[in-house]
Every structure is written in structure tokens, then in C-alpha cells.
């Protein structure tokens, strides 16, 4: 049996302000730093240690991972970063308030943009300075692969090849793996691992900073999964994520 730990980054400054973030590089809030610290403590209390870590190219996930590894006394382990683990690109919604957007377009429309499988928001124009083609961290990636907007289906299409080529291979080699990423890149992976339907993924909410453990068989099929931490806090955190796209 293998174990895999997934962690969504702690609350970011834009999570706190209820803004669509996507590929915008936003720091952790004070609460997010505390969440990452608590995630590290819970992992340490439960005896977890790791051989390799994977993260995105975005600072909120990187900082969450660094805080967790410091808590574990494991800042020395290898960390591999990839744009393929970035948050889903929210296109022209990036920077907009979720509740205000729900007031304008309706809660149902915002829910579809946030949680549906195959409906992307309006795209960014390539001339927009927020477009990833203008970000130096992605200069080695073909422009055709950098998104102007994404639905979850698009996110799955970039996450799963990285899972297969890099992460799954590390697990099979016997390495203990932690992934620090984002709500939608982790939803993409969970959908694949659990073979979830397009409808069921709509209801999945992953809370910030709380370690999610997958126990996998020899073929990397899930045996079971569970969050580490206080059950009431976990439930409240999941409800908070679910309510982000509702009107004020």
C-alpha cells in the first residue's frame, strides 16, 4: 500500500477577499500561514515524513509547502514545481469578487463557472498583461499550451499527464509524496483517482491547508481517503469553500 498526501494551499489574500484568483500570483494571508502551520503540525503528530514534494509555480502553494516542510524538519527534500499543477485559469474573471459576480450573473452561472466540468469563463485576450504569455516564469512553455481560460476538463488535461509521468512514477519507486497545489488542480486529480462523474465533481469542495491522505493499492487505485484534523473544523472549512460563489 502507498500513501499520498494532498494539500490545498492555505488561505490567500484573494481568498480572504473572495476574489477569483486563478493564475494570479497572490501571497498567503495571515490565516493562510496559520493553516499551513497547522497542516504541518497535524502531519508531524501523525508521523508523516516525505521523500519528495510537488507543487505549482505559484507562491501561495510554494509557501504552504515550505511551511509544512519546516514544521516537519524536512526542508531539505527535493521539490519539483510545474505549471501543470497551477490553479485552473479563470480567464477574465480573475480579480473579480465572487459574490459581486454572482449578483451580476446569478449564483447558478457562477456555480457553473466555478464548479462545472466543461464550462470555462470568458477568456483573457493575449494582449492583456495578466495573460501568462507575459509572465517570465512560463517563458519555456509553448504559447499554445498557456491558457487564456480553463474549465475543469482543461485542467484535468494538463494535470493527469504530469501525474502519470512524474508523480505516479515517484510513488511506485517507493517515495513518500506530498503535493501542495490548488483547489481545482487537486479536484482534477481527485476526479481522476476516484473516477468521479462530471456531475459529482460539481459538489466536491477541498478546504485550504488541511492534509488529505489517499491510501492507494499497488496499481495506485484508491483504497480509502481521509482528512487529517478536527472533524468539525474540516466540515466548517468545506462549507466555507462551497459558499464563496453565493450572493452577499
From Swiss-Prot:
Major enzyme class: isomerase
EC number: 5.4.2.11
MF (Gene Ontology): phosphoglycerate mutase activity
Keywords: Gluconeogenesis, Glycolysis, Isomerase
GO biological process, one term: gluconeogenesis
Pfam families: His_Phos_1
Annotated function: Catalyzes the interconversion of 2-phosphoglycerate and 3-phosphoglycerate.
Protein name as annotated: 2,3-bisphosphoglycerate-dependent phosphoglycerate mutase
Record lineage: Bacteria, Pseudomonadati, Spirochaetota, Spirochaetia, Spirochaetales
Gene designation per UniProt: gpmA
Amino acid at each position: 500500500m502507498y500513501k499520498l498526501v494532498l494539500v490545498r494551499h492555505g488561505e490567500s489574500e484573494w481568498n480572504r477577499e473572495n476574489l477569483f484568483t486563478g493564475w494570479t500570483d497572490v501571497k498567503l494571508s495571515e490565516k493562510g500561514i496559520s493553516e499551513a502551520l497547522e497542516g504541518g503540525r497535524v502531519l508531524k503528530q501523525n508521523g508523516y515524513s516525505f521523500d519528495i514534494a510537488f507543487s505549482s509555480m505559484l507562491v501561495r502553494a510554494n509557501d504552504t509547502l515550505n511551511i509544512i516542510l519546516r514544521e516537519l524538519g524536512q526542508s531539505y527534500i527535493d521539490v519539483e514545481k510545474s505549471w501543470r499543477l497551477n490553479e485552473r485559469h479563470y480567464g477574465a474573471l480573475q480579480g473579480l469578487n465572487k459574490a459581486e459576480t454572482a449578483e451580476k450573473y446569478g449564483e447558478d452561472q457562477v456555480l457553473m463557472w466555478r464548479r462545472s466540468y466543461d464550462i470555462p469563463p470568458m477568456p483573457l485576450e493575449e494582449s492583456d498583461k495578466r495573460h501568462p504569455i507575459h509572465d517570465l516564469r512560463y517563458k519555456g512553455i509553448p504559447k499554445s499550451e498557456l491558457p487564456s481560460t480553463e474549465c475543469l476538463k482543461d485542467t484535468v488535461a494538463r494535470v493527469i499527464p504530469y501525474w502519470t509521468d512524474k508523480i505516479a512514477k515517484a510513488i511506485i519507486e517507493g517515495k513518500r509524496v506530498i503535493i501542495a497545489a490548488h483547489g481545482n488542480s487537486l479536484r482534477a486529480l481527485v476526479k481522476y483517482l476516484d473516477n468521479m462523474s462530471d456531475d459529482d465533481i460539481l459538489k466536491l469542495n477541498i478546504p485550504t491547508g488541511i492534509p488529505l491522505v489517499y491510501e492507494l493499492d499497488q496499481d495506485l487505485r484508491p483504497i480509502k481517503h481521509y482528512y487529517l484534523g478536527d472533524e468539525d473544523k474540516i466540515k466548517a472549512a468545506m462549507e466555507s469553500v462551497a459558499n464563496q460563489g453565493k450572493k452577499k
